[in-house]
């Protein structure tokens, strides 16, 4: 099968984890991507990760490099740069089960974060970059003695073009999504 379209894309990430206090972790992440000669309808990067009211599988491609707190599929570009700082705070780290029930609570942790980044076509300026602040609550359990299941619930506020307040959730490696009702989110944040 031949094609008249020929383009290349590359993406990469740099991650650094610094242990703080007992088991707290400060995480620094830089992510970048570039698509060379891609036609406009094949631009791979979008600024947002979640679409309100939609559930989908956990992203494992370019979507995983997107920012939280921004509308998904509003704008695409052929260049991407995102910096993330997370502080991972363990709230409970204790294996707890009940008698012989095959369900084990492993740990619970809180992750406040800040993200700064942009996608663009051609040239950009530092003033075009967007940022977001949010927090996630993570839970890990073991079911059936050997299946680890991670879940998370988060809230984030994006600032800049296409920024919005999002409440999102996920079961790691299975699915994730965002709440649809804007009034529920506003009431939860501002009351």
List the predicted regions and their residue ranges.
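C-terminal outer-membrane beta-barrel translocator/porin domains of Gram-negative envelope proteins
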Residues: 1-104, 120, 178-191
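Membrane-embedded beta-strand positions of outer-membrane beta-barrel proteins
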Residues: 14, 28-32, 85, 110-114, ...
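Residue-level signature of outer-membrane beta-barrel architecture
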Residues: 16-18, 87-89, 139-141, 157, ...
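Outer-membrane beta-barrel transmembrane domain signature
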Residues: 23, 109-112, 116-133, 142
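Flexible, surface-exposed loop regions and adjacent strand-edge segments
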Residues: 43-51, 128-130, 168-172
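Short beta-alpha connecting loops at secondary-structure transitions
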Residues: 66-68, 150-158, 165-167
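Membrane-interface anchoring segments and C-terminal beta-barrel signals
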Residues: 127-150, 157-162
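Outer-membrane beta-barrel "beta-signal"
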Residues: 134-135, 164-191
């Amino acid at each position: 099968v031949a094609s008249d379209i020929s383009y290349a894309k590359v993406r990469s990430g740099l991650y650094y984890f610094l242990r703080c206090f007992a088991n707290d972790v400060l995480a620094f992440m830089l992510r970048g991507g570039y698509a060379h000669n891609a036609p406009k309808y094949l631009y791979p990067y979008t600024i947002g990760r979640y679409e309100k009211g939609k559930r989908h599988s956990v992203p494992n491609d370019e979507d995983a490099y997107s920012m939280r707190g921004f509308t998904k599929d509003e704008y695409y570009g052929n260049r991407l740069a995102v910096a993330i700082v997370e502080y991972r705070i363990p709230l409970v780290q204790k294996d707890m089960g009940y008698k012989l029930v095959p369900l084990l609570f492993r740990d619970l942790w809180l992750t406040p974060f800040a993200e700064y980044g942009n996608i663009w076509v051609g040239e950009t300026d530092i003033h075009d970059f967007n940022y977001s602040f949010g927090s996630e609550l993570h839970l890990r359990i073991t079911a059936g003695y050997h299946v680890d299941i991670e879940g998370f619930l988060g809230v984030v506020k994006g600032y800049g073009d296409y920024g919005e307040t999002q409440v999102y959730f996920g079961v790691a490696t299975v699915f994730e999504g965002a709440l649809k009702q804007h009034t529920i989110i506003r009431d939860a944040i501002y009351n």
